[in-house]
Amino acid sequence: TAKFNVIYNGKNLGEVTIGVPGEHNVKNALAAITVGLETGVNIEDIAKSLKSFTGVYRRFEVKGEESGIIVIDDYAHHPTEVKATLEAARSINLGRIITVFQPHLYSRTQDFYKAFSDAFSETDILILDKIYPARELPIEGVTSDLIFKEFNKNYPKESYSFNEKSEIFSKLKEIVKDKDIVIFQGAGTITNYCDEYVSIVKNKY
């Protein structure tokens, strides 16, 4: 959740709570509040609606919480979205953030690998899966290692790059501990990885 005070036309209308964390969600809520107030909706009704809003499918969606480990599924597949998600995670948790990212499209990886490296600056541990190609054919020299190498060059943090789901799960089993947030990010099959990992956590942690 996130809490903030609303000041409208110089008047403090009080505190509002939204059911999702992150500065970007606060900004969206403020825009919605402004529209509501301008069209005559009272702040109490607006605040009640916002408090019950818990987000949309695959947008920082908490899929499981077991043994102090929070597992999140997130659709972010552009550097700006990735950064916003990780900042939201940082705002609600003092534990480690472990990001499992599946790059989407060879062309996007080629164009934005440097921006992706910077977007992951908030994560404590980065795990990269192979690129999800969707409709694209491979581009020579373009793999997840572009992001991996750029990240390692700029941020002295723990990071891994794997080609197989089994390798990812093996590494997670080795490193995940109490109070960690594990975020599965991407627009491809990574959401299936997340569901499978939730089952693993429930059964083995």
Model region roles, listed by residue range:
Residues 2-4, 8-125:
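Nucleotide phosphate-binding/pyrophosphate-handling subdomain across enzymes
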Residues 14, 107, 136, 192-193:
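Glycine/Thr-rich phosphate-binding loops of Rossmann-like dinucleotide-binding domains
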Residues 19, 72-73, 162-163, 184-185:
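Thr-Gly-centered strand-to-loop micro-motif
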Residues 84, 111-113, 139-140, 173, ...:
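Short amphipathic alpha-helical segments
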Residues 103-106, 131-134, 187-190:
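Short glycine-rich anion-binding loops that position phosphate/pyrophosphate groups of nucleotides
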Residues 117-178:
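C-terminal helical cap/extension that packs against the catalytic core
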Residues 128-131, 200-205:
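Short, flexible loop segments at boundaries between secondary-structure elements
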Residues 167-198:
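A glycine-rich beta-strand to alpha-helix segment
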